[in-house]
């Protein structure tokens, strides 16, 4: 009897993560509104949707947890990047490396984070640019301007120029319009994006 209880609690701990992983994949492939709890249940291999309700009351709660988890992980990664590198150019280069690596290794994460309009189904969520992770990126740009590494322009415009190129490249890779892996375009995208904001 004790062994049965242990097995059930172990599978419960795994199941919440499995629900999140399945939902992430489905949201990224089909979109939030085209994904039902039944789709998530089927992807996880549960018999009924009550297995999903055991962890999350709504599909919106799943999406919110996913977004928070992804943004928390990104924020921690950015902290690591900032500790390892002093210059804004080095920090931005490592963030670009991370985004391109994620696009190749975990495309669902990049799709969900950058290209799915989460404000359509999470209206109360903090706007992406106001989250801790993206505030840190904006601070990197501000510091780069202050240190004279980045042109003296509005920091938000510098963000737009730089990440407009990076994000559009990633979007085209995810859509299949750019046929090779993201890694194949990383160097060229970096040089172009950095060239837009670097102080000459």
Indicate where each model-derived feature is located.
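Amphipathic alpha-helical packing segments from all-alpha helical-bundle domains
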Residues: 72-75, 79, 122-147, 156-160, ...
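A short, glycine- and basic residue-enriched loop/turn
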Residues: 16, 59-60, 110
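Helix-turn-helix
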Residues: 26, 33-61, 65
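N-terminal intrinsically disordered/low-complexity leader segments
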Residues: 1-14
């Amino acid at each position: 009897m004790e062994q049965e209880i242990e097995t059930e609690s172990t599978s419960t701990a795994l199941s919440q993560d499995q629900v999140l992983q399945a939902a992430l994949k489905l949201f990224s492939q089909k979109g939030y509104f085209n994904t039902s709890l039944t789709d998530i249940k089927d992807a996880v291999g549960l018999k009924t949707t009550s297995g999903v309700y055991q962890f999350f009351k709504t599909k919106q709660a799943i999406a919110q947890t996913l977004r928070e988890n992804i943004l928390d992980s990104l924020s921690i990664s950015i902290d690591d990047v900032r500790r390892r590198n002093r210059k804004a150019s080095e920090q931005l280069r490592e963030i670009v490396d991370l985004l391109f690596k994620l696009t190749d290794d975990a495309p669902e994460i990049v799709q969900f984070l950058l290209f799915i309009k989460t404000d359509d189904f999470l209206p109360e969520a903090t706007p992406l640019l106001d989250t801790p992770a993206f505030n840190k990126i904006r601070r990197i740009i501000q510091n780069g301007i202050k240190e004279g590494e980045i042109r003296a322009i509005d920091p938000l415009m510098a963000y737009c120029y730089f990440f407009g190129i990076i994000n559009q490249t990633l979007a085209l890779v995810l859509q299949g319009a750019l046929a090779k892996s993201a890694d194949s375009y990383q160097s060229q995208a970096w040089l172009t994006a950095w060239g837009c904001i670097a102080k000459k």
